Amino acid sequence: LVWPLNNSGIGFMGFKILAINPGSTSTKIALYDDEQPTLALTLRHSAEEIARFPRIIDQLDWRKEMVLEALAKNNFDVKSLSAVIGRGGLIKPIESGVYEVNAALKNDLVNAQREHASNLGGLIAEQIAQAAGVKAYIADPVVVDELDDIARLSGIPECPRISIFHALNQKAIARRHAEKVGKRYEDLNLVVAHMGGGISVSAHCKGRVIDTNNALDGDGPIAPERAGTVPAGALVNLCFSGKYSQRDVLKMLA
């Protein structure tokens, strides 16, 4: 990124950043001047409104317009933005970092293998950024994959362990801790836990998450919206009881 000049062309003025976090029943937005928040809003979506859309991706234009309307009501001109960043979605596995939303990333978000509201984050950001004449980004999506090879092993070769965890929050908290103790994140070994609707517990080794649980599928600790790791034999019996579809069982887990 290039620091913008002030109106006189001399010196610097702060970045104006729009952050967008789409969830299942809300879209949260925030405006920042550099690191200072200047506006934070939660746009609620009722079950009836959501039900109008066959797929989550079909909500894109509707949610984008809600964001733009909310900004307009607060007398904010998107043309003054320096950048837009959205919550990363269920794209292909990538390393931790900030990624520009380009054609390849847009394609991955639109055609994501699993439906999730977070897939809309980068897409909404890109459309608003385009109107503002700036770039759009995502950072540390849940598919961040830095696992050691040994962490991918399970007792069944056909069932390798995969990395899906609360990367954005975990990385941010780890870096904040490093700053607090006066060290670089890349020099520390940490265990970090995200405790929300899902729980992920990860081993951070010198700036990389080398082991974690698949929080999306309910692997790991019991959580408010996840079953946690369940007894394998009982799960097999449940699957073949004839009472439940694959969708039913997946819903039980996560």
What are these regions (language model features)?
Residues 6-7:
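Intrinsic-disorder-associated, low-complexity terminal segments enriched in Asp/Asn/His/Tyr and depleted
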Residues 15-20, 81-85, 190-194:
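Short glycine-aspartate micro-motif
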Residues 17-58, 215:
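Short glycine-rich, Thr/Ser-proximal phosphate-binding strand/loop in the N-terminal lobe
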Residues 32-37, 96-108, 134, 152-157, ...:
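A glycine- and small-aliphatic-rich helix-loop capping segment at beta-alpha/alpha-beta transitions
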Residues 40-79, 103, 109-113:
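N-terminal phosphate-binding loop and adjacent alpha-helix
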Residues 71-117, 143-155:
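Short beta-strand-loop/turn "lid" adjacent to the catalytic site in phosphate-handling enzymes
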Residues 117-127, 138, 145, 153, ...:
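Glycine-rich phosphate-binding loop plus the immediately following alpha-helix
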